UniProtKB/Swiss-Prot annotation:
Organism: Homo sapiens (Human)
Disease involvement: Microcephaly 21, primary, autosomal recessive: A form of microcephaly, a disease defined as a head circumference more than 3 standard deviations below the age, sex and ethnically matched mean. Brain weight is markedly reduced and the cerebral cortex is disproportionately small. MCPH21 features include mild intellectual disability, intrauterine growth retardation, short stature, and microcephaly.
Modification after translation, per record: Phosphorylated by CDK1. Its phosphorylation, as well as that of NCAPH and NCAPG subunits, activates the condensin complex and is required for chromosome condensation.
Top-level taxonomy: Eukaryota, Metazoa, Chordata, Craniata, Vertebrata
UniProt main location, coarse: nucleus
Gene name per UniProt: NCAPD2
Keyword field: Cell cycle, Cell division, Chromosome, Cytoplasm, Disease variant, DNA condensation, Mitosis, Nucleus, Phosphoprotein, Primary microcephaly
Name of the protein in its database record: Condensin complex subunit 1
Subunit and partners: Component of the condensin complex, which contains the SMC2 and SMC4 heterodimer, and three non SMC subunits that probably regulate the complex: NCAPH/BRRN1, NCAPD2/CAPD2 and NCAPG. Interacts with histones H1 and H3.
Phosphoserine, modified sites: S20, S585, S1310, S1315, S1330, S1333, S1366, S1367, S1370, S1371, S1376, S1395
Motif mapping: Bipartite nuclear localization signal: 1342-1362
Interactions with SMC2 and SMC4: annotated segments: 1-603
Keyword tRNA-binding: no
Length: 1401
């Protein structure tokens, strides 16, 4: 068939070209074999050189055959074919303009060019797609083989780099489509198949996941421009819209690519309508359908979000279509629509020059954003806060919205979602950084100016009202105001007899009507009503023909007539007459009337200025009010955020730290609290948190403002000193760690150290507190670089321990702390060969310490005791033979005490008087000093002496090893084996430890030792609280006794009863608190001795004193987490602290359970006992507190097996519950567990246990809440069992257990649970013991009862003898504070040092 006679139909699939489908339709005649392809291609090339692009009409079968065998042919042939087809199409596109412009073109020639065009384009595009398919497969192989050699593999597969060839082909097709090729078709209507052929190729290229890589950017741009031409010239919009929607649903990587394309079409190609079409398609998607297609929804959401960023103005007109998705289930679509709104606010609807309609739109968008700040989905709430953060950062939020959005952010701080909390903090930080009010936000500083300016505004408004009232009163109003009095005056005048009238007002002959009217007006204005009336009566006779005096009605009374005339004169006609006939010579009338009537006009400039001032003042007050409200909100936020500083999530903690840095920089006074509160985080195990704290303090303190290095150093020292004011020991230790870090990294300039020394030595004038803080800072820095203090030791001794009196003990104490940091006690060991750093006994430091302590002993200074404690510690830490120095100090102080006592005796005149008494403070000082020496002597023996013994042994062994003959080393293989196993060293360590223990037990408190001399005195004070009732003395004596008990197990055992008596019965909280610490230390040192007394330790957790409860909580936390005490049901006392009114104690308890939850199944094992104790009517807590505690504890149960086991035990516990309250508690606990389907089956299996209790509404509600939770995450197959459980619940609730039998579900022969009988008082716990499966829930005996002997069958009936702490007691026998013999625990249970796992099992 001649080429001009057939028609080439574009096929949907290549196989269609092999079949005849109609008259004159082109059909491939033969698919050539592979071996014939190269010569046929060469023939095609020869024909092309002769005939041009029309050569394709005779050689299409060759190209078709190449496409057919594409996978099998040689890469070189593929490349040659591609290059040749590019050349053919390019040549055709160059020739077509002339052909299209040829008016003489015949139909057959036009048809030939149309066929050639379609064949050329079809061949080139199919070849492009074939290469693209092979490239995609190669990329998949590359993912398996790795990235190396990828280009080489691609080149091997194709014979060239395909990625570089795509762009030229696409540009060639674009160039071709830009021609007016539609004239080749009949009626100039291009066929849809041709457009689909070209555009379909573009869409297939876009499906490649690598298309959005940076290297493929030229290809993306070429595709975009090709599709842009198809949109503008070939009516491709509808098809493009449908295709884009489909691709967004199926290809997640395409959202940013399509956004870039659509943005380009809308702007450069003027196709704005495509944005509306695509958005309309997305808007019409059913929300339920989107919730089932997360992949498609993700694509739509990403597309809308990025499109709003690029073309917000174009998208804004279509926003109404998307609003339905704000109510849809899918949170991603809500986020996308909200993000689009935010972009429009940022890019289109910002600024002060918006029109009213634009402002309304902006306000609607912001209202929507605020509303979704409370969205049910945490990701939406979080996104809203992020969007508001951007809006605030770009200053696009109207000032009128500040308070509302800040309030939203503050409210979201309490959100359950960590992500929401984090973004709320970021939003508040953005508000601070971009607030329009002030760089310093202190509500205290703002309150004064606000009050002052508000008062000024009120005064200005009052003046304004007064001026307005007096300046321009309406004449009608004035007339109405004067009318009553005017009438009264007129009636009085008219009632007077004719002869008694006052002298009439004279009217001069020269006066005109206007003059007289002016006079009347002035008289009325001055309230001279009588004269005005008389003059009016006179004028009615004088001017009978002139208005208004000529207006006389015979029927009117004289009173009415005169009032009418006066009214006309005052209210207007006089003024109008004056305007018509002004006269300067009329004086009073003209002047008066002009002033009255024109006063507002004359004061217009003044009034305008007044209005401006009032407006300015109103704006100032509004500004101050907004600033004050903003500051108050930030202050409120600080309180909430500070509580989040110890969250488990690292990112939240980092945000909190950054927030406080910013707040501090803005001068908010409460920020210092947060800056101090973050200090303990320096000990965090999370490197990110620790580094955040260090960075915070770098920002706040290491870069102060100042013109010089010295000025900066001064500011830095001043800021750090403020942190030390009223700081606790813990705060100081944290700050010391931070400064140590800075010093080690040389971040503190030498000028800082220099200035600190100048202040410490008083070279720079400073107050005593500043001097003290300087020494403290020097001591902290010495942790990092000991030479800071070590090189100036004598100077430091002179500063704090000089010979002046009275001594500044606070400064002396800080000097001791600073000197202590020059030793290596906190440094990593350099090896046991190096002797510890010690100073000789004769060193001036110890002379001054001995003298200062001894001299201060006899003076009642409260600061002497803490100084003395630090001094004793320093002596034992740095001195050679510290026990000698401290013995001298003890002897010197005791000698002075005896001297004082002797002075008292000699001063008594009558020897029969009561024996001389030592001043209380001296006795307190003496016992406190003895206690400190006792404890430090113990520490010295167990650390320093033991360490030195070990060091010398190691050196001795090394020396012996060196001197041994080589033959001797191999003689004893047994010895070598022991050495390798470390048995020799371990035995030696045990020997040394035994030696130290023997010294402590046998020697330190032996009668010949110095410390032993103080024991009788100490025991006498502790045993006689009535005789020695001074609180400070009691505190010192109890603490000293605890320290003495640490030395010897024998002494400790003999005094434990006394210690625990004081712990329980002392009326002084400080004594109970001190003894709680002491007994905690004893529990670690002598666990077997203290174990029987453990219930007394737990008892302090319910102490009425807040200080004691806090100390007890800390001590028990330490003991339990270190496995030093057995954890039983008594741990419920720790649980009660979760509801303590003191926030610090509650936080301590929460932290305890957080840590305990990390110890395997600890909390799971304890829960049964805790629930039993807390729900016990006599020992437990109220119902609401019980809920709070259990909600926290049950949150730690996360394992399915634990949950299932607990559910079973709790259900069975219903059988043995004694009260309705216990049943409600159990139901609540069940409702708080994270139940699964297996847990629900356990509940169904044990339904009989609680079915008869469901008539109680609260129990029924608790179980219904379980059903609600299970439904939320239930799978379709699990819903049946949930329905079954709910039906059972409802049946039992309405009809009791009999209702179950009416239901045809569950087990047919379910038995009714026996009705729970109330147990008798005598056998209160019997039901629990009888239930084998509920052993874990047996309520232990109340803690308040004493331990019984094994054969005791009933509670002791005797009451404990109470000890009365009274100063009126007469004899020492009656003053005994010890427990009686039967109160002392007899059975001691050794505590085995087993692993935590064994201990818990």
């Amino acid at each position: 068939m001649a080429p001009q006679m057939y028609e080439f139909h574009l096929p949907l699939s290549p196989e269609e070209l092999l079949k005849s489908g109609g008259v004159n339709q082109y059909v491939v005649q033969e698919v050539l074999s592979i071996k014939h392809l190269p010569p046929q291609l060469r023939a095609f090339q020869a024909a092309f050189r002769a005939q041009g692009p029309l050569a394709m009409l005779q050689h299409f079968d060759t190209i078709y055959s190449i496409l057919h065998h594409f996978r099998s042919i040689d890469p070189g042939l593929k490349e040659d074919t591609l290059q040749f087809l590019i050349k053919v199409v390019s040549r055709h596109s160059q020739e077509l303009p002339a052909i299209l412009d040829d008016t003489t073109l015949s139909g057959s020639d036009r048809n030939a060019h149309l066929n050639a065009l379609k064949m050329n384009c079809y061949a080139l595009i199919r070849l492009l797609e074939s290469f693209e398919t092979m490239a995609s497969q190669t990329n998949l192989v590359d993912l398996d083989l790795g990235g190396k050699g990828k280009k080489a593999r691609t080149k091997a597969a194709h014979g060239f780099d395909w990625e570089e060839e795509r762009q030229p082909i696409l540009q060639l097709l674009t160039q071709l489509l830009q021609l007016d090729i539609r004239h080749l078709w009949n009626h100039s209507i291009i066929e849809e198949e041709f457009v689909s052929l070209v555009t379909g190729c573009c869409y297939r290229l876009l499906e490649n996941p690598t298309i959005n890589h940076q290297k493929n950017r030229p290809t993306r741009e070429a595709i975009t421009h090709l599709l842009g031409v198809a949109l503008t010239r070939y009516n491709h919009m509808l098809s493009a819209t449908v295709k884009i929607i489909q691709m967004l649903q199926h290809f997640e990587h395409l959202a940013p690519v399509l956004v870039a394309a659509v943005s380009l079409w809308a702007t450069d190609y003027g196709m704005k309508s495509i944005v509306g079409e695509i958005v309309r398609e997305i808007g019409q998607k059913c929300p339920q359908e989107l919730s089932r297609d997360p992949s498609g929804t993700k694509g739509f959401a990403a597309f809308l979000t990025e499109l709003a960023e690029r073309v917000p103005a174009i998208l804004m007109s279509s926003m109404c279509i998307l609003l339905d998705h704000l109510d849809g289930e899918n949170y991603m679509m809500r986020n996308a629509v909200l993000a689009a709104m935010a972009e429009m606010v940022l890019q289109v609807l910002s600024g002060d020059q918006l029109e009213a309609a634009a402002r309304d739109t902006r306000d609607q968008f912001l209202d929507t954003l605020q509303a979704h700040g409370h969205d049910v989905n945490s990701f939406v709430r979080s996104r809203v806060l992020q969007l508001f953060t951007r809006i605030v950062q770009q200053k696009a939020l109207p000032l009128t919205r500040f308070q509302a959005v800040v309030a939203l952010a503050v409210g979201r701080l309490a959100d359950k979602s960590v992500l929401v909390c984090k973004n709320a903090i970021q939003l508040l930080a953005s508000f601070l950084a971009n607030n329009p009010f002030s760089c310093k936000l202190s509500d205290a500083d703002l309150a004064g100016p606000l009050q002052k300016e508000t008062q000024k505004l009120q005064e200005m408004r009052a003046q304004r009202r007064t001026a307005a009232a007096s300046a321009v009163l309406d004449p009608e109003e004035e007339w109405e105001a004067m009318l009553p009095e005017l009438k009264s005056t007129l009636q009085q005048l008219l009632q007077l007899p004719q002869g008694e009238e006052e002298i009439p007002e004279q009217i001069a002959n020269t006066e005109t009507t206007e003059d007289v009217k002016g006079r009347i007006y002035q008289l009325l204005a001055k309230a001279s009503y009588k004269k005005a009336i008389i003059l009016t009566r006179e004028a009615t006779g004088h001017f009978q023909e002139s208005e208004p005096f000529s207006h006389i009605d015979p029927e009117e009374s004289e009173e009415t007539r005169l009032l009418n005339i006066l009214g006309l004169i005052f209210k207007g006609p006089a003024a109008s007459t004056q305007e018509k006939n002004p006269r300067e010579s009329t004086g009073n009338m003209v002047t008066g009337q002009t002033v009255c009537k024109n006063k507002p006009n004359m004061s217009d400039p003044e009034e305008s200025r007044g209005n401006d001032e009032l407006v300015k003042q109103e704006m100032l007050v509004q500004y101050l009010q907004d600033a004050y409200s903003f500051s108050r909100k930030i202050t409120e936020a600080i309180g909430i955020i500070s509580k989040m500083m110890y969250e488990n999530t690292t990112t939240v903690v980092q945000e909190v730290i950054e927030f406080f840095v910013m707040v501090f920089q803005f001068g908010v006074p409460q920020a210092l609290f947060g800056v101090r509160r973050m200090l303990p985080l320096i000990w965090s195990k999370e490197p990110g948190v620790r580094e955040a704290v260090l960075n915070a303090y770098r920002q706040l303190y290491l870069n102060p403002k100042g013109d010089s290095a010295r000025a900066k150093a001064q500011a830095l020292i001043q800021n750090l000193s403020l942190l030390l004011v009223d700081a606790s020991v813990g705060t100081i230790q944290c700050l010391e760690e931070i400064l140590c870090e800075f010093v080690q990294k040389d971040e503190l300039k030498p000028a800082v150290t220099q200035l600190l020394w100048e202040r410490a030595t008083e070279k720079v004038a400073c107050c005593p507190l500043e001097r003290c803080s300087s020494v403290m800072l020097l001591g902290m820095m010495a942790r990092g670089k000991p030479e800071i203090v070590g090189s100036n030791l004598d100077t430091l001794v002179s500063i704090g321990l000089d010979e002046k009196f009275p001594q500044d003990y606070r400064l002396a104490q800080q000097v001791c702390h600073a000197i202590a940091n020059i030793s290596d006690r906190r440094k990593p060991s350099l090896g046991k060969r190096h002797p510890p750093f010690r100073l000789p006994q004769e060193h001036r430091l110890f002379e001054r310490l001995r003298e200062t302590v001894t001299k201060g002993f006899v003076h009642p200074d409260p600061l002497w005791i803490p100084f003395k404690e630090v001094a004793v510690t320093l002596i034992y830490q740095l001195a050679e033979g510290p026990e000698v120095i401290c013995a001298q100090i003890l002897q010197g102080c005791a000698k002075q005490a005896l001297e004082k006592l002797e002075e008292k005796r000699t001063s008594q005149e009558d020897p029969k008087e009561s024996p001389a008494m030592l001043p209380t403070f001296l006795l307190m000082n003496l016992l406190s000093l003895a206690g400190d020496v006792a404890l430090q002597q113990l520490v010295h023996l167990e650390q320093a002496v033991s360490g030195e013994l070990c060091r010398r042994r190691v050196l001795r062994e090394e020396q012996e090893h060196k001197t041994k003959d080589p033959k001797e080393k191999n003689t004893s293989s047994e010895t070598t084996m022991e050495e390798e196993l470390g048995l020799v060293g371990a035995t030696a360590d045990d020997t040394e430890a035994e030696l130290i223990r023997g010294i402590c037990e046998m020697e330190l408190l032996d009668g010949k030792q110095t410390l032993a001399a103080f024991v009788p005195l100490l025991l006498k004070v502790c045993n006689n609280p009535g005789l020695y009732s001074n609180p400070d003395l009691s505190a010192a004596a109890s603490l000293a006794l605890g320290k003495f008990c640490m030395i010897s197990a024998t002494f400790c055992d003999s005094q434990l009863r006394l210690l625990f008596t004081m712990l329980e019965k002392s009326p002084l909280p400080i004594v109970r608190s001190n003894l709680m610490v002491a007994t905690g230390d004893l529990a670690i040192r002598f666990p077997n001795l203290v174990d029987p007394w453990t219930p007394h330790l737990y008892a302090r957790l319910r102490d009425p004193a807040q200080q004691v409860r806090k100390t007890a909580g800390l001590v028990m936390t330490h003991l339990i987490l270190k496995d030093m005490v057995k954890v039983k049901g008594q741990v419920s006392e720790m649980a009660v602290l979760l509801i303590d009114p003191e926030p610090q104690i509650a936080a301590l308890a929460k932290n305890f359970f957080n840590e305990l939850s990390h110890k395997g199944n600890a909390i799971y094992n304890l829960l049964p006992d805790i629930i039993s104790r807390l729900s016990d009517p006599e020992l437990g807590v109220e119902e609401e507190p019980f809920h709070t505690i259990m909600k926290q504890l049950l949150s730690y149960i996360t394992k399915d097996k634990q949950t299932e086991s607990l559910v079973e035990k709790l259900c069975q516990r219903f059988r043995t519950s004694r009260t309705e309250r216990q049943q409600r508690d159990l139901a609540y606990c069940v409702s708080q567990l994270p139940l699964t389907e297996r847990g629900l089956r356990k509940m169904l299996d044990n339904f009989d246990c609680f079915g008869d209790k469901l008539s109680d509404e609260s129990i029924f509600s608790a179980f219904l809440s379980v059903v609600g939770k299970l439904r939320r995450g239930a799978k379709p197959e699990g819903k049946a069992i949930i329905d079954e459980f709910e039906q059972k619940l409802r049946a039992c609730h309405t009809r009791g257990l009999d209702g179950i039998k009416e239901l045809e579900i569950g087990q047919a022969g379910s038995q009714r649970a026996p009705s729970a009988k109330k147990p008798s008082t005598g056998s209160r716990y019997q039901p629990l013991a009888s239930t084998a499966s509920d052993n874990d829930f047996v309520t232990p005996e109340p803690r308040r009862t004493t331990r019984r002997h094994p054969n005791t069958q009933q509670r002791a009936s005797k009451k404990k003898p109470k000890v009365v702490f009274s100063s009126d007691e007469s004899s020492e026998e009656d003053l005994s504070a010890e427990m009686t013999e039967d109160e002392t625990p007899k059975k001691t249970t050794p505590i085995l040092r087993a692993s935590a796992r064994r201990h818990r099992s």
